[in-house]
UniProtKB/Swiss-Prot annotation:
An MF annotation (GO) of this entry: NEDD8 activating enzyme activity
Family recorded in the similarity comment: Belongs to the ubiquitin-activating E1 family. ULA1 subfamily.
Function: Regulatory subunit of the dimeric uba3-nae1 E1 enzyme. E1 activates nedd8 by first adenylating its C-terminal glycine residue with ATP, thereafter linking this residue to the side chain of the catalytic cysteine, yielding a nedd8-uba3 thioester and free AMP. E1 finally transfers nedd8 to the catalytic cysteine of ube2m.
A GO biological process held by the record: sorocarp development
Quaternary structure, from the entry: Heterodimer of uba3 and nae1. The complex binds nedd8 and ube2m.
UniProt source species: Dictyostelium discoideum
Chain's gene name: nae1
Keyword Aminoacyl-tRNA synthetase: no
Protein name: NEDD8-activating enzyme E1 regulatory subunit
Any single GO CC term annotated in Swiss-Prot or TrEMBL for this entry: cytoplasm
Annotated segments matching region Interaction with uba3: 321-334
Amino acid sequence: MSTSTTDTDKYDRQLRLWGEDGQSKLERSHILLLNGSATGTETLKNLVLPGIGSFTVVDNKKVTESDLGNNFFVERSSLGKPRATVVCELLRELNDRVKGFSVEECPIHLINNNISFFKDFSLVVANRLSEEALLTLSQYLTEQNIPLLITNSYGYIGYLRISTPEHQIIESKPDDPIDDLRIYNPFKQLVDMADALELDKLNTQQHSHVPYVLLLIKFLKEWRSTHNDKMPETRAEKDEFKKFFNSHSWSADEMNFVEGIQNLLKYIQPPRVPGDVQNLLKDPKTNITENSDDFWVLVAALKEFMTNNDNTLPLHGNVPDMTSETHNFIQLQKGYQEKALADLSEFSGYVDQILTKVGKSSISSDLVKKFCKNTRFLNIIRYRTISEEYNQPKTNLIKSELEQADTVMVFYILLRGIDKFYKTYHKYPGSSDDFESDIPLLKTVITQYLAEINISNDLVKDDYIAEFVRFGGSELHNIASLMGGVTSQEIIKLITHQYTPLNNTFIFNGINSTAGSYNL
């Protein structure tokens, strides 16, 4: 994507997070929201501002007094008007580059009578839908490979569930990755640069500015020559090497030697392929056919690259800041970049071979390059379907969590009970004037549900049930706003394929500000 000057100015801060490629994916996305509730509109707000391409709101309800109390995207003058139209108009005002559409129709009616309506969206956000509707919708979206996010706020409780068949992550962007400097097994350019060092011929300024990477490579090679070609492994050996390394320093304040000692333990470990990447390489989907998607073609090419490179991943090529004179750093940086380009060229060759073999069209060079630079951070998440969650519940996990003090898992049980209550009584518990009469009814529903999943009902206290009835099906704006932020953040991860989204359920307790995530 070639971002215009205006785009760069408008989206400057987020471009630093997910870059132009991520922004391009956002700007091509079309998000569907089912029900324009407070939680739903807060979610869209946080997607319209960073510049999704377009959104559609499907909602058959009219704006009511309760909407005025919790939804910032309706006004008093909107009372009685179609909620889909009202929230769409106000959301569009946030960003004139984003297109917004409204459909005044019942989401459940669309699901039951026109399911193909959903096939052209990038992602679907569902809010306050029945279990039956969610099962039907999620099954269809799974077949279409379209992510579904179910987000709700109920009183002080927030809930988010992600469902998508397979989410591929190329840029997981871990918080504190270790730079790939190849000190343990340096490539030829690094060895040549280290061997060329004549430290005794340098002046004090030059000696104190030799990059620590080259110092470590040089002195590790010397140390190994007197230790049967072994790297320092035991604690005693590492301490011995530190003394040997420091013995070549001309003064205690040479920062390059200080940096070498500080980074020693990180870089004298044998290179390890991350577990997530190992799992990808073993996946049956690396057996490529003409129907394989690009991600798995690239994984198969990576497998071939590693087979021919002593199980080593392609070099990223980035060099961190370090004490060095400018010309030395540029020379070092050039060595890493040349090796990274050579690895990319070899990797691209394997990609082309695989594509030719199975008769697939080419993969964009930008994607190949991005994949090759991020091979240490690859991952996939295969989500359980909503049907699996409902029909094959993880009883042991749920029971174990319920036995913990102050667990948020209890709210998962209560929310499932609320859905079942609504199915039976066509209302939310506590939404009528005589709310106390709903307490025993909700307790009965929850007791029946717990019996279905073989969990004792004494793990859900009556106080929680009464509190949920007092919520009366209400949405509170502060909880809706928080859940809108959480949901939109996960949507951006899913659309950009950057960072790692949660798997698969998030529950927030606004009463005491605790939260939990579970793979249900």
